[in-house]
């Protein structure tokens, strides 16, 4: 058991999924290139892994599922740290995919261009304060999210502008005695009552301060909000500490965060735009422009492109399994579960997590590849011969809907932990402790979503529904693999993936 996690997957003599889990977290090892994405999108074959894919040494027959001694797994140190961190906010952007024959790029035209800070990994709109997962100040007039301290009160951009226009133009509205309720959706219906509400909450043209909320006041309000939450629910402090711990582990385990990926997709980085691969010619051109980790020159490959892309996905999946396994070990209580149950949870959970995180690399037109250096179009992937052309389309369909939820990395960190700790997986020996851990994670997720997305009251329920969708995607993926097993007799699966797919749905 002294081998490292990386060695257990690269060495052709070590192909057990349990070996992957049993690698000691106390050792400082280099598993994979820390700049690699954590989902299967680097298309190509690694020279080190070619022996594992040898058609004679490994067939498509699935090897028996085995377990090993997990005594080397060390429990990660878990500190109860107050949860305080600025989270990324991702807006909706239009992606204008501009394809050129020899110079391809992704052109983005956001309605309100954000700027990207590599240091803080934040998206910030020019007219908004940086998002904070605990910062949910409401407009005193309509209840919408306040953009700052305007005319003496916390107000949104809409009410600030309404009050300014009314005062500047000296507008007089028709009297209304209905005392209309002013909220986000109705604020434009009765201008008289809206202006009266502005005055009632204290908006004044003579207010000393207006504009963005002062940092000192923001910190004070943040402390008050945290204190109020903790007083209402004493357990919330522990839940926020758990969320902070999971986020930190997430950042360490997965080198390419959603914030970084979306920055690349929206062109808000100092790096050059990713090279667009949309046909065979651009694929060949891409080999000269993109530093692929796994790929060997197309001219030197005897296998067709569809098979090479499929095999490249396999090796990226293997790396993703490594990263997900390390993250799972950081979930409080996971390493204390029955050792066979740890293997079962990962066996069933890894691909659901891979497709969850793959969505961050996707838009409706394509997917980032090779650490964001390239962008392979959806149409090109669909054009591959069957059954290979059918593999990615369900993932794109899921990604478009999943990305509409506008989750950020702090949300995803908890969500993937919930996926791992699913107590209804087949073959579990001791379900109760698994369900106890997941219950705690679900509470942390619900609190996180309420604080981070106060305007989306149904987000928690919608997100749980996505877990069902993910299982269906994995089921369809396994079915396609069975088709390949019958039609592509000269192909083989990576041994680790063979073990994972055995008896999976």
Curated annotation (Swiss-Prot):
Glycyl lysine isopeptide (Lys-Gly) (interchain with G-Cter in ubiquitin), cross-linked positions: 252
Annotated segments matching region Interaction with FAM120B: 205-280
Domain spans labelled NR LBD: 238-503
Motif (9aaTAD): 495-503
Matching InterPro entries: 1Cnucl_rcpt, NHR-like_dom_sf, Nucl_hrmn_rcpt_lig-bd, Nuclear_hormone_rcpt_NR1, Nuclear_hrmn_rcpt, PPAR-gamma, PPARgamma_N, Znf_hrmn_rcpt
Region (Disordered): 1-26
Subcellular locations according to the entry: Nucleus; Cytoplasm
Compositionally skewed regions (Polar residues) per UniProt: 17-26
Bridged cysteine pairs (disulfide): none
GO CC, alphabetical: cytoplasm; nucleus
NR C4-type zinc finger segments: 139-159, 176-198
Activity modulation notes: PDPK1 activates its transcriptional activity independently of its kinase activity.
Listed GO MF terms: chromatin binding; DNA-binding transcription factor activity; DNA-binding transcription repressor activity, RNA polymerase II-specific; E-box binding; nuclear receptor activity; RNA polymerase II cis-regulatory region sequence-specific DNA binding; transcription cis-regulatory region binding; zinc ion binding
One of the GO BP terms on file: fatty acid metabolic process
Keyword Nucleus: yes
Biological role: Nuclear receptor that binds peroxisome proliferators such as hypolipidemic drugs and fatty acids. Once activated by a ligand, the nuclear receptor binds to DNA specific PPAR response elements (PPRE) and modulates the transcription of its target genes, such as acyl-CoA oxidase. It therefore controls the peroxisomal beta-oxidation pathway of fatty acids. Key regulator of adipocyte differentiation and glucose homeostasis. ARF6 acts as a key regulator of the tissue-specific adipocyte P2 (aP2) enhancer.
Free-text note on domains in this protein's UniProt record: The 9aaTAD motif is a transactivation domain present in a large number of yeast and animal transcription factors.
Descriptive protein name: Peroxisome proliferator-activated receptor gamma
């Amino acid at each position: 058991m002294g081998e490292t996690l990386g060695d257990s997957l690269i060495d052709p003599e070590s192909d057990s999924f349990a070996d992957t889990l049993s690698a000691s977290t106390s050792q400082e090892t280099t598993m994979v290139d820390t700049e690699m994405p954590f989902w299967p999108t680097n298309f190509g074959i690694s020279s080190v892994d070619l022996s594992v894919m040898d058609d004679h040494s490994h067939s498509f027959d699935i090897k028996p599922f085995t377990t090993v001694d997990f005594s080397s797994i060390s429990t990660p140190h878990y500190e109860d740290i107050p949860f305080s961190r600025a989270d990324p906010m991702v807006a909706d952007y239009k992606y204008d995919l501009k394809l050129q024959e020899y110079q391809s790029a992704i052109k983005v035209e956001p309605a309100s261009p954000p700027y990207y800070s590599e240091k803080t990994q934040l998206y910030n709109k020019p007219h908004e304060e940086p998002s904070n997962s605990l910062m949910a100040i409401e407009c005193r007039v309509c209840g919408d999210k306040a953009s700052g301290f305007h005319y003496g009160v916390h107000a949104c951009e809409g009410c600030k502008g309404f009050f300014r226009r009314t005062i500047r133009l000296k507008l007089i509205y028709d009297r209304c005695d209905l005392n209309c309720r002013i909220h986000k959706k109705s604020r434009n219906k009765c201008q008289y009552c809206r202006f009266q509400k502005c005055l009632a909450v204290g908006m004044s043209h003579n207010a000393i301060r207006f504009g963005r909320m002062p940092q000192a006041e923001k910190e004070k309000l943040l402390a008050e909000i945290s204190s109020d939450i903790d007083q209402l629910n004493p357990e919330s402090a522990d839940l926020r500490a758990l969320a902070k711990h999971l986020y930190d582990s997430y950042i360490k385990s997965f080198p390419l965060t959603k914030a970084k990926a979306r920055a690349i997709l929206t062109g808000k980085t100092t790096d050059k735009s990713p090279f667009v691969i949309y046909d065979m010619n651009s694929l060949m051109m891409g080999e000269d422009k993109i530093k692929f980790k796994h790929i060997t020159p197309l001219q030197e490959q005897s296998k067709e492109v569809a098979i090479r892309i499929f095999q490249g996905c396999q090796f990226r999946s293997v790396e993703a399994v490594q990263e997900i396994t390390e993250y799972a070990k950081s979930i409080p209580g996971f390493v204390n579960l029955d050792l066979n149950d740890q293997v079962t949870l990962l066996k069933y959970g890894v691909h659901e997590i891979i497709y969850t995180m793959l969505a961050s690399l996707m838009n409706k037109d394509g997917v980032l590849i090779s650490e964001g250096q390239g962008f392979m179009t959806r149409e090109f992937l669909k054009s591959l011969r069957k059954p290979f052309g059918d593999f990615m389309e369900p993932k794109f369909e899921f990604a478009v809907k999943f990305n509409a939820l506008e989750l950020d990395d702090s949300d995803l960190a908890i969500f993937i932990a919930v996926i791992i700790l699913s107590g209804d997986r087949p073959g579990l020996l001791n379900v109760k402790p698994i369900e106890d851990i997941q219950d705690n994670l679900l509470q942390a997720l619900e609190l996180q979503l309420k604080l981070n997305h106060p305007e989306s009251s149904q987000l928690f329920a919608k997100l749980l529904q996505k877990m069902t969708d993910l299982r269906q995607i994995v089921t369809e993926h396994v079915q396609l693999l069975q088709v390949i097993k019958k039609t592509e007799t000269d192909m083989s699966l990576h041994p680790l993936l063979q073990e994972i797919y055995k008896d999976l749905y």
